[in-house]
Amino acid sequence: MKEITVTEPAFVTRFSCSGSACRDHCCKGWKITLDKTTVKKYLASKDTTIRTIAQDHIILLKKNNSHWGEIKLPSALGNCPYLDEDRLCRVQKTLGAKALSHTCSSFPRAHHTYKNEVRNSLSLACPEVTSRILNDPDAMALSEKTIIQQTFNTAPLFPAQQKLLNLFCLSLINHANSSTEAALYALIKFVMYAQKFAKIDDAALGELEQVYAALLEQLQTGVLAQELMNIAPDSKVKTSLVLQMQDYFRSLPLNRGSVILDHYIQCLLRVLTAEEGVSMEQKVSDIESSLARCLQANEQQKNWAFRNLILYKIWENNFPNQPNVDPLRALYIIVAEYAFIKLLTAASVHERGRIEWDDVTNIVYSFHSRSQHNSEVAKNFHRHIETVRTGDDLSMIHLLT
């Protein structure tokens, strides 16, 4: 028998689907794939409704056993035909949860499997997940348990060096106090130092531990926050990000989350272009000031909401250990996403005169629904971010100033 370590953040442990109460349920507006067993089960079901819907709405593709068919939706934003008038799944109500396809039974859950370890997570494309991340100060607290199974998982070993690097990065963000930007600045410095090593071995980890300790002290004493404040801002980097992002999302076909995200993008563009004779760069500065004032009045939640978002990114991506991805490039993507989400939030705050965390939840989940629902969508999105980067990873510092 073999011991397997299962690690997961608190938001995973505490998650439960909100069902019919969900603000934007996952049974609409995107591709629902069905495996071969599920297709056959529905087509041969003794339940007339299940069988008839299958005959009318399952497109047989037979690409492979896990992608044997797809649900045909009535429109780009239409509901799955198995969704009933109570916004609940007819399959689950009639045949039970075990009759659900892998797609439907697994979302929003994700499992990152290694030889003797499993890391559990959830997708931010689910609004309930996003709400927990933003509203629970302990959402990213990690817990471990050991399970016993007959054999090790058929997956590569999770190297101890990679695990420690990931923990260093998580810890830097977790000690951000009230400045997530300063913590990200510390992370940039840490990654730049780590890239000096051709190989991360025990000797390199010893040096990196000293660098981590020094950066942590500078974070806690406010040295890094002051250093970041002293960097001359370049708002053109942020306006370029806004224009590139809105171009990208407008180019996508309609799907789940598109109407919600477009509402906030339009709000941002409206605020940035409202006054003649005022540059977009100046308006970016103005709305960021509006957000800062509102967050100052909401001291408690501001200390964890955006921090938790970055912790999630580091955990979910196993940063800085993504295969075949330069760590600084990966960090640029995290910072660019964070900066755009903050700007969308700032525009909403500027128009409302106050921060509504429901707005932030809407922004974050719809952003991820549109940009990272699956690996193919995420790759396309990350390729687009390259046009903002313009070959300079360190320009991300200006997204933090």
Swiss-Prot record:
Transmembrane segments: none annotated. Disulfide bonds: none annotated. It is an enzyme of class 2 (transferase). GO terms for molecular function: methyltransferase activity. The keyword Methyltransferase applies. Keywords: Methyltransferase, Transferase. GO terms for biological process: methylation. Its EC number is 2.1.1.-. Signal peptide: none annotated. It comes from the Bacteria. Belongs to the FliB family. Post-translationally modifies flagellin by methylation of epsilon amino group of surface-exposed lysine residues. This is Lysine-N-methylase. It comes from Salmonella typhimurium (strain LT2 / SGSC1412 / ATCC 700720).
